[in-house]
């Protein structure tokens, strides 16, 4: 990711400005909730970020035609919440989450973030990354978890959740546990544990064990392959997807499967995410 033209942190910094300019419109959160027992599939737009920069309406139209049911934002490409909601509605898409910096959830920024996401119909406010020191020790994990617990209480009355997304570095050991497991052991059940299967395995973690250890905490989960040939899409590497789905559908409390693809091989990003969805459908999803 370090060589990307647009880093996740750069994308998030752009999101702050979009939130700050939001008009006071609230359209509710119903659009984000799946209506059937089957878990719907969304796409993390970071997977196709350069295409989104060039032509976001075209990308949303394309992913909807592929069969994706929702999208998770990682930046808003200079558009207001009203504009984004209109584009989603035009394409029959739901907002299944947003990746937003911790700074957008604190202090005076929180109200604007809530308002922006209410307009999108999104209840899931997911912090995608934190500096290493936030989870570097038992005390750091406890202190950071307290921040998330307090935020979870603040947004609960709005029908919303805060959460944290897994990166490889989160699975380094702190004592006899991974930083990830230690952090979530201090978090309240209201804090969403957004596992990223590929990132976890890349960091030496065990995503299956974490899903079992924290039942009901994985309201959204990132589906990402690990291993296999260069640019392997979901189903083409070493992940035990049958086990992932079984855990999500029995104990995880999962409301959304979210595809995130960051390696493309000889495919374009849009071709890669289409391939991921095709493979998921072959697996019965």
Language model features with spans:
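Active-site acidic/histidine proton-transfer and metal-coordination neighborhood
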Residues: 16, 23-24, 69-70, 77, ...
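A short, local hydrophobic-aromatic micro-motif
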Residues: 41, 69, 96-97, 123, ...
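Histidine-centered catalytic micro-motifs
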Residues: 43, 162-168, 221-223
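Flexible loop residues that form catalytic
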Residues: 46, 76, 103, 130, ...
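Active-site-adjacent beta->alpha loops and helix N-cap segments on the catalytic face
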Residues: 78-83
């Amino acid at each position: 990711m370090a060589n990307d033209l647009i880093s996740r942190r750069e994308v998030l910094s752009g999101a702050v400005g979009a939130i700050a300019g939001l008009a006071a419109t609230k359209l509710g959160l119903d659009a984000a909730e799946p209506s059937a027992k089957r878990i719907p599939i969304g796409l993390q737009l970071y997977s196709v970020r350069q295409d989104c920069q060039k032509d976001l309406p075209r990308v949303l139209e394309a992913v909807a035609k592929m069969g994706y049911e929702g999208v998770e934002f990682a930046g808003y490409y200079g558009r207001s919440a009203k504009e984004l909601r209109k584009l989603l509605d035009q394409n029959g898409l739901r907002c299944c989450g947003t990746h937003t910096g911790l700074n957008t959830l604190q202090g005076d920024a929180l109200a604007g973030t809530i308002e922006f996401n209410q307009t999108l119909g999104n209840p899931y406010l997911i912090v995608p990354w934190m500096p290493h020191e936030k989870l570097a020790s038992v005390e750091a994990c406890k202190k950071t978890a307290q921040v998330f617990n307090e935020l979870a209480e603040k947004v609960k009355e709005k029908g919303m959740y805060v959460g944290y997304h897994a990166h490889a570095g989160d699975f380094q050991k702190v004592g006899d546990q991974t930083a990830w497991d230690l952090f979530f052991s201090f978090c309240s059940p209201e804090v969403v544990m957004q596992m990223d299967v590929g990132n976890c395995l890349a960091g030496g973690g065990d995503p299956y064990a974490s899903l079992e250890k924290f039942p009901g905490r994985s309201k959204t989960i990132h589906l990402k392959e690990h291993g296999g040939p260069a640019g392997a899409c979901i189903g083409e590497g070493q992940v035990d997807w049958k086990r992932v789905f079984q855990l999500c559908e029995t104990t995880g409390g999962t409301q959304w499967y979210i595809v995130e693809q960051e390696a493309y091989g000889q495919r374009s990003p849009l071709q890669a995410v289409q391939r991921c969805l095709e493979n998921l459908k072959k697996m019965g999803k």
